[in-house]
C-alpha cells in the first residue's frame, strides 16, 4: 500500500511538472522589505467608522465640543478615541482632564508622542501650572514639526514664571538658541522679539535693541518684523545700522517681489552719488543709455570696437556699495515697469562701476528692458555684455538674446552665427536647447526645413531631465518630413511620411499629456485616421484599468513625519497632517531614481487627502515630471490625477456654461495661473485663482453688475472664478480658438491682434513658436498641455481637437 501511494505521488509530480503553472503571487512581506510598507486605503482609512464616533468628530470640527463629548465614552480604551476625547476636552476649555489624557497618550509613544506632549503642555498653561508646562515642553523633541512653537511658548512661559532679570533673560536666550542657530525651522524674528522683551525687562536696553534690530533688519519678511522695528523705535536713537545690512534687507525684500518696500529701504541708504566726477552732461535716461553704449564700445556693427574701447572701465570707479544700491534700484524699477527710471539707474552703474558682477548684471537688466520695449538698442547692449564679460554666467544669455535681436532686425546670418557660438562654446548653457531649436527654426522660416533636421537630431539626442526637448524635436521633425520636397521620388516621399508617422505615433501613444503630444494627435488624425482611432481605443482601455491599490513608502518608510501624517489623517486632522507632510525629508526618494517615483507619489497622495491640492500637484509637477509625461503605467496615471485635480470643479462648470468655454480650458487656466492657490499673489499684483489684475477685474465686475466689488474679493474663489472665467469667455468669443484666447489672456488682446495681423496665415503650431514674448509662448504651451491632460484623464482618453487654421482678427 505504501509502495502504491509512493508511485501515485511520483506520477502526480510528473504530471504537475509537465503542466505550466501560474507564477507565484508576490510575497507582501518580501515586497515590504524591498520597497517599504504598502500604504493604501486600509492604512489611511479614518479610525472613526462607527456612526457615533463619526458624529462626535463632526461636532468637534464644527466647533461644538460639548456635543462631541456627549457622544464619546468617558474612559476610552483605544488611542484614537482618547485623541478625540482629549481634543474635545481642550476645545471645551477643560484643560485638567484633557492634559491627563494627552500625557497618557504621550506615554504610549508612537509617531504622535511629541504632539501629545505639546498639547499637554498647552493644557498646563491653560491651567496656570507653569512648572508642569515647563516639564512637558522640555520633553518635546526638536524634530517635532511644531518645535518652533514649543520653543517660543516655552520662552514666553519662562518670562512669566520667573522674576525678570539677567538670569531669566539668559534662560530665555538659551531656550531660543536652537532657533537662532538654525537647528529648528522657525520665524527667527519672533524669537528675537521675545528675547528682546526679556532683555528689556532685565534692564539691558542695548541687548534688547540688538535682538529687535536683528528681527526687522535681517528678517524683513517675518510677520514680527514690524513689531520688532516699532519696539526698537521706542528705545530712541541708537547706533547707526551699517549700509551693507540695510542693503541686504532691501535685497531680501526685492527677491520676495516686495519691490516698493525695497525701493523705500534703498532710498534711505546713505551712499555717495555715482555721478560725482563721471556722469555725462545729459542726465536724461536716453543720455545715460547713449553714454553707456559708448563706454562699452557697443556701437553699430559697421564700427568694430577696438579692444581698448571694449575693455574701457571707469578711470575713477564709484563706491562699490553705491553701485549695488543703484543696481538694486534699477532691478526694482524694472519689475515695477518704470522703465525710464530703471534705465537711468542702470546706465549709471554701467558707466561708473568697475566690479564685474555688478556691472554685468546692470548691463543684463538694461538689455532686458530694451528687449521688452522692442528698442533697437537691445542688440548692441547684448553684444556689449557678451564681449566685455565672456566668462560671466550671463554671457550665454547675452549671445542668445543678441541672436533674437538680430532676427528682429532681419539679419539671419548674424543670428545663426551667434547661435552657433552659443552651441559650440557653451555646452552646459540652459539655453543651448533653445539655441538648437532656433537654428532649426531659421531654416524652417527660410523655406529650407530639411536643412534644419540636423539641429533637431541634436536636440532629440541631448541629455535632459524631463523629455520636453525630445518631444519638440520629434514633432517638428515629423512636420518637416510631411512637407513636400522638390524633386523627391515617390519612394523617398513614402519613406519620409513613414518616418514622420513613426514620430507622431511615438508622441501620441507615449506623451499624451504634453503640448507636442496634443499637436501630434491632430496631425496623426489627418495622416492615419485608423491608427489614431486605434490609439484612442487603447487609451480608453488603459484608463479603465484599476489604479494600484496601495503605494510603497520606499526610502521614506521610517520618516517620523510620514508616520505622523498618516496617523493625523486617520484622526481626521487634515491641517495638522499637511504640516507633517511638508516636513518629510524627500531627498532619499529624489536620489533613488525611478525607485523614488512611488514614495514621491505617496507624498502627493497624502497632500491630496489632507486637502492641500496645491502642494499635491506641485510634488508631481516638480519631482515627477518624467513619470508624468508617460502615463502608460498605473502609477503614472495615479500621479497624473494628482497633478491635474478637478479642484473647484462645481464653480468652474457653472461659470464655463455661462461663458461658453470648455470647462477643462478654464480648469487649465486655474492650474497654470495660480497652482490652485486661492490666495496667490503675483509680483505684478495679479490676484487669486485666475490671477486677474485688479483693473481688469473691475472692468468685468462692472459688466456683470457685481456691486461692492473690491480687489480683496479676488481672494474669494467663487468671485475670482466668475470674473476670470467671464473674461476668458470674452476672449474666446473674440478669437474663436483656445490658443488665441490663452495668448490674449496673458499678453492682452491688442498684442494678439497685432500678431495675427502679421502672422495670422501661419498654422497654429508655427504661430505659437513665433509668439515674440517668451512668457506668453510658454504660457500658451503650458495651458494647452493642461487642457489636453484634463481631457485625457477625465474624458476616456480623448484629447481636444485644435484647428491649425487661424483667422486674422
Where on the chain are the PLM-derived regions?
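Acidic, polar-rich low-complexity tracts and alpha-helical solenoid repeat scaffolds
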Residues: 2, 17-666, 670-672, 676-683, ...
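Bacterial N-terminal signal peptides
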Residues: 6-15
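Catalytic and substrate-binding regions of cell-wall glycan-acting enzymes that process beta-1,4-linked
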Residues: 491, 495-498, 507-508, 605, ...
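Mg2+-dependent phosphoryl-transfer active-site scaffold
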Residues: 722
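A glycine-rich, coil/turn loop motif that links secondary-structure elements
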Residues: 686, 713-715, 742
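A short, structured beta-strand-centered segment in the mid-to-C-terminal lobe
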Residues: 709-719
Amino acid at each position: 500500500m505504501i509502495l502504491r501511494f509512493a508511485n501515485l505521488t511520483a506520477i502526480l509530480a510528473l504530471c504537475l511538472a509537465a503542466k505550466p503553472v501560474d507564477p507565484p503571487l508576490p510575497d507582501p512581506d518580501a515586497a515590504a522589505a524591498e520597497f517599504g510598507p504598502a500604504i493604501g486605503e486600509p492604512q489611511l482609512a479614518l479610525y472613526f467608522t462607527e456612526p457615533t464616533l463619526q458624529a462626535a468628530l463632526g461636532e468637534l470640527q464644527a466647533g461644538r465640543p460639548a456635543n462631541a463629548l456627549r457622544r464619546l465614552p468617558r474612559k476610552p480604551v483605544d488611542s484614537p478615541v482618547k485623541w478625540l476625547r482629549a481634543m474635545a476636552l481642550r476645545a471645551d476649555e477643560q484643560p485638567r482632564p484633557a492634559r491627563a489624557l494627552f500625557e497618557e497618550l504621550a506615554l504610549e509613544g508612537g509617531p504622535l508622542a511629541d504632539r501629545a506632549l505639546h498639547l499637554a503642555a498647552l493644557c498646563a498653561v491653560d491651567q496656570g501650572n507653569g512648572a508642569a508646562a515647563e516639564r512637558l515642553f522640555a520633553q518635546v523633541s526638536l524634530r517635532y514639526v511644531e518645535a518652533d512653537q514649543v520653543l517660543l511658548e516655552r520662552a514666553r512661559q519662562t518670562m512669566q514664571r520667573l522674576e525678570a532679570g539677567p538670569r531669566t533673560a539668559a534662560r530665555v536666550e538659551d531656550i531660543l538658541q536652537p532657533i537662532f542657530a538654525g537647528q529648528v525651522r522657525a520665524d527667527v524674528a519672533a524669537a528675537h522679539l521675545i528675547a528682546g522683551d526679556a532683555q528689556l525687562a532685565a534692564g539691558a536696553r542695548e541687548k534688547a535693541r540688538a535682538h529687535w534690530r536683528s528681527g526687522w533688519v535681517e528678517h524683513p519678511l517675518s510677520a514680527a518684523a514690524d513689531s520688532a522695528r516699532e519696539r526698537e523705535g521706542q528705545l530712541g536713537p541708537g547706533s547707526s545700522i551699517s549700509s551693507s545690512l540695510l542693503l541686504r534687507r532691501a535685497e531680501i525684500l526685492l527677491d520676495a517681489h516686495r519691490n516698493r518696500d525695497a525701493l523705500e529701504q534703498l532710498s534711505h541708504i546713505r551712499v555717495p552719488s555715482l555721478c560725482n566726477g563721471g556722469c555725462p552732461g545729459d542726465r536724461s535716461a536716453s543720455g545715460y543709455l547713449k553714454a553707456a553704449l559708448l563706454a562699452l564700445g557697443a556701437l553699430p556693427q559697421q564700427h568694430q570696437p577696438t579692444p581698448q574701447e571694449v575693455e574701457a572701465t571707469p578711470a575713477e570707479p564709484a563706491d562699490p556699495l553705491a553701485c549695488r544700491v543703484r543696481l538694486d534700484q534699477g532691478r526694482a524699477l524694472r519689475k515695477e515697469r518704470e522703465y525710464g527710471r530703471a534705465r537711468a539707474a542702470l546706465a549709471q552703474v554701467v558707466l561708473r562701476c568697475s566690479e564685474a558682477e555688478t556691472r554685468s548684471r546692470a548691463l543684463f537688466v538694461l538689455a532686458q528692458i530694451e528687449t521688452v520695449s522692442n528698442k533697437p538698442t537691445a542688440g548692441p547692449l547684448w553684444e556689449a555684455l557678451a564681449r566685455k564679460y565672456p566668462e560671466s554666467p550671463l554671457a550665454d544669455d547675452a549671445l542668445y538674446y543678441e541672436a533674437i535681436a538680430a532676427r528682429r532686425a532681419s539679419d539671419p546670418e548674424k543670428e545663426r552665427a551667434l547661435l552657433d557660438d552659443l552651441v559650440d562654446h557653451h555646452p552646459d548653457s540652459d539655453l543651448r536647447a533653445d539655441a538648437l531649436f532656433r537654428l532649426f527654426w531659421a531654416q524652417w522660416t527660410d523655406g529650407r526645413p530639411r536643412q534644419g533636421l540636423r539641429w533637431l537630431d541634436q536636440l532629440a539626442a541631448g541629455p535632459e531631465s524631463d523629455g520636453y526637448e525630445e518631444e519638440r524635436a520629434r514633432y517638428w521633425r515629423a512636420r518637416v518630413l510631411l512637407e513636400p520636397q522638390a524633386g523627391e521620388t515617390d519612394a523617398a516621399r513614402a519613406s519620409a511620411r513613414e518616418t514622420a508617422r513613426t514620430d507622431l505615433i511615438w508622441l501620441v501613444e507615449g506623451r499624451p499629456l504634453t503640448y507636442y503630444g496634443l499637436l501630434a494627435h491632430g496631425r496623426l488624425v489627418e495622416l492615419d485616421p485608423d491608427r489614431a482611432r486605434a490609439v484612442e481605443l487603447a487609451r480608453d482601455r488603459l484608463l479603465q484599468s484599476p489604479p494600484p491599490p496601495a503605494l510603497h513608502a520606499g526610502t521614506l518608510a521610517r520618516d517620523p513625519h510620514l508616520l505622523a501624517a498618516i496617523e493625523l489623517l486617520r484622526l481626521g486632522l487634515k491641517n495638522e497632517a499637511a504640516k507633517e507632510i511638508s516636513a518629510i525629508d524627500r531627498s532619499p526618494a529624489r536620489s533613488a531614481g525611478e525607485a523614488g517615483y512611488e514614495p514621491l507619489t505617496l507624498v502627493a497622495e497624502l497632500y491630496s487627502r489632507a486637502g492641500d491640492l496645491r502642494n499635491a500637484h506641485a510634488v508631481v509637477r516638480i519631482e515627477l515630471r518624467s513619470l508624468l509625461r508617460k502615463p502608460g503605467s498605473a502609477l503614472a496615471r495615479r500621479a497624473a490625477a494628482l497633478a491635474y485635480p478637478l479642484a473647484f470643479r462645481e464653480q468652474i462648470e457653472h461659470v464655463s456654461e455661462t461663458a461658453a468655454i470648455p470647462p477643462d480650458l478654464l480648469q487649465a487656466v486655474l492650474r497654470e495661473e495660480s497652482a490652485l492657490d486661492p490666495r496667490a499673489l503675483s509680483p505684478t499684483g495679479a490676484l487669486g485663482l485666475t490671477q486677474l489684475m485688479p483693473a481688469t477685474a473691475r472692468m468685468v465686475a462692472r459688466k456683470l453688475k457685481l456691486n461692492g466689488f473690491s480687489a480683496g474679493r479676488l481672494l474669494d474663489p467663487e468671485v475670482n472664478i466668475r470674473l476670470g472665467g467671464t473674461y476668458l469667455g470674452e476672449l474666446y468669443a473674440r478669437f474663436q480658438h483656445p490658443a488665441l484666447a490663452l495668448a490674449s489672456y496673458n499678453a492682452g488682446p491688442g498684442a494678439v491682434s497685432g500678431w495675427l495681423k502679421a502672422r495670422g496665415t501661419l498654422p497654429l503650431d508655427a504661430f505659437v513658436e513665433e509668439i515674440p514674448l517668451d512668457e506668453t509662448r510658454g504660457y500658451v504651451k503650458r495651458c494647452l498641455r493642461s487642457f489636453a491632460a484634463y481631457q485625457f484623464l477625465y474624458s476616456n482618453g480623448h484629447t481636444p481637437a485644435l484647428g491649425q487654421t487661424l483667422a486674422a482678427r
